[in-house]
C-alpha cells in the first residue's frame, strides 16, 4: 500500500510537473506534511515503507525566531510538520489566523502576516534544503492546500541556496500540474501495477 504522498509523487513524476525527471521529491503541504520519492522511473518506498517521509525530522538550522520547542503528535520535538503544516504555521504565527488567512493578510501588507509568511518560506526552504543535500532531486513538486500560495515559489527558491551545500542550485521547485487530483491519479497508476519498485 502507498500513502497519499507516494501517490502524489507517482502522479506528478509520471505525467505531471516532474515528468521526464530522473528524481522527483513530492511534498504535500496541508493539514500535515508528507513526502514521497520517485527515482529512476520507480516509486521508492524502502524496507520500512517510509521513504520520503521527512516531515517527522527536526527542522534544520533552528533559530530563535522559530519560537518555543513544540511537541509533535508523534512524540518528538520540533518536527518539520509542526512548522510547515497549515495548523503548525497557524499556531506558531500567533496571529489567530488560519494559514490561508495569513497568506491573504500578507498580500494586503499586514506587517505581522508578512513576517509570518517570510519566516514560513525560510522554514520551508530549510526543510527542503535538507532533502536536496541528501538526495539532490531534479524536481521538487509541491501539492496540498498550502502549495496554492504563489508567494512560496519565488521566496523559497531564493532562500534555498543559502542552505544547500553547493554554489549553485539546479533543483526546480514547481507546483503540482494535476493539483488535488494527483493523489487519485497516482493511486490509479499504482493500482495498474505500473512503476512500483519495492
What are these regions (language model features)?
Residues 1-13, 17-19, 25-27:
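ATP-dependent carbohydrate kinase catalytic cores
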Residues 4, 30, 187:
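Active-site glycine-centered loops adjacent to acidic/histidine catalytic or metal-binding residues
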Residues 5-6, 50, 180:
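A generic "binding-loop/recognition-motif" signal
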Residues 6, 42, 146-147:
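Short, glycine/serine-rich, charged loops/turns that create anion-binding
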Residues 11-21, 61-198:
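ATP-binding/phosphotransfer module of carbohydrate and carboxylate kinases, centering on a glycine-rich
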Amino acid at each position: 500500500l502507498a500513502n497519499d504522498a507516494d501517490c502524489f509523487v507517482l502522479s506528478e513524476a509520471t505525467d505531471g510537473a516532474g515528468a521526464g525527471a530522473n528524481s522527483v521529491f513530492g511534498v504535500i503541504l496541508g493539514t500535515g506534511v508528507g513526502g514521497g520519492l520517485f527515482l529512476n522511473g520507480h516509486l521508492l518506498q524502502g524496507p520500512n515503507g517510509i521513504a520520503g517521509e521527512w516531515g517527522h525530522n527536526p527542522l534544520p538550522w533552528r533559530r530563535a525566531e522559530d519560537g518555543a520547542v513544540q511537541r509533535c503528535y508523534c512524540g518528538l520535538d520540533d518536527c518539520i510538520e509542526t512548522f510547515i503544516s497549515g495548523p503548525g504555521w497557524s499556531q506558531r504565527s500567533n496571529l489567530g489566523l488560519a494559514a490561508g488567512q495569513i497568506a491573504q493578510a500578507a498580500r494586503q501588507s499586514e506587517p505581522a502576516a508578512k513576517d509570518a509568511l517570510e519566516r514560513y518560506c525560510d522554514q520551508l526552504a530549510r526543510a527542503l534544503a535538507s532533502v536536496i543535500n541528501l538526495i539532490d532531486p531534479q524536481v521538487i513538486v509541491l501539492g496540498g492546500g498550502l502549495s496554492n500560495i504563489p508567494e512560496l515559489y519565488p521566496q523559497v527558491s531564493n532562500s534555498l541556496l543559502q542552505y544547500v551545500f553547493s554554489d549553485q542550485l539546479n533543483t526546480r521547485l514547481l507546483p503540482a500540474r494535476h493539483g488535488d487530483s494527483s493523489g487519485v491519479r497516482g493511486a490509479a497508476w499504482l493500482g495498474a501495477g505500473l512503476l512500483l519498485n519495492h
